[in-house]
Amino acid sequence: EESYLFSTVAHKVSAFSAAHPEAKVLRMGIGDVTLPLAPAVVAAMQKAVSELGKKETFRGYGPEQGYDFLRESIQGYYARHGIALDANEIFISDGAKSDLGNILDIFDTDNTVLIPDPVYPVYVDTNVMAGRKIVFADANAENGFLPMPDESVNADIIYICSPNNPTGAAYSAEQLQAWVDYARAHGAVILYDAAYKCFVSEKGLARSIYETKGAKECAIEFCSFSKTAGFTGTRCGYTVVPNDLKFDGISCNKLWLRRQTTKFNGVPYIVQRGA
């Protein structure tokens, strides 16, 4: 019956501030940006606006999967980090949050979901709303806030957020390999939230789950421009669904493409140019 956590916190803060205007509130709810968009982003968006105002360069409906120029740019980013992706494996979204919830449309409601605790509340709320069984993996001081696979637990869908929201703990490539091996052995799919990957600076820590062997057969990766470029209000992200990933013998890439073309009209051209 409660609303979404960050929405509830925002309403409570607003009510308190209205009743106590003299109080200085330290906001511990959703993490928002504090700096404006970069000049290069603003210039690209301004140019895109001008294009839409001219008959020769006007654009209507865009491709649901995203414009080629952005998908190919993301493809190049992964290539520079040693990860080869096909452009058709990249789906442009209006942010990681949307896709983290919407991706569940391609999975059955009788799937068991494994979620680390504590973690980003979207994972829990979307599955509670769908009626799925949830199993929690404790992230605590004893395990460095990085729970590892438990062979006694069977799950169909596994959420991993690294670096983690809210703890900041990040998995090494070696630790992620253990999760990939577990998922492949159990026929599970990993939903890997890489929204905070730009903050990884220590050697040995993974920025992408595709740095591990076999991940393309069991993992979907979600990324966001909110943390890398301050797009919390502009809204843009992307999701990688490998062609090699199959769940119960069915291509997740094809299922997600069908879902997106049916329920999503794509991210605005102006925003994608900025991204």
Segments from the language model and where they lie:
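N-terminal small-domain helix-loop-helix segment of the aminotransferase-like
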Residues: E2-D94, N102
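Helix C-cap/helix->beta junction micro-motif
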Residues: H20, A130, A185-H186
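Proline-centered loop/turn at the N-terminus of a beta-strand
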Residues: K24, T112, K133, D156, ...
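Short catalytic/ligand-binding loop motif for oxyanion handling, primarily in non-cytosolic enzymes
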Residues: T34-A38, P166-A169, C198-F199, A229-T232
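Conserved core of the PLP fold type I
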Residues: E56-D181, K197-T212
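Conserved core segment of the aminotransferase class I/II
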Residues: T212-A275
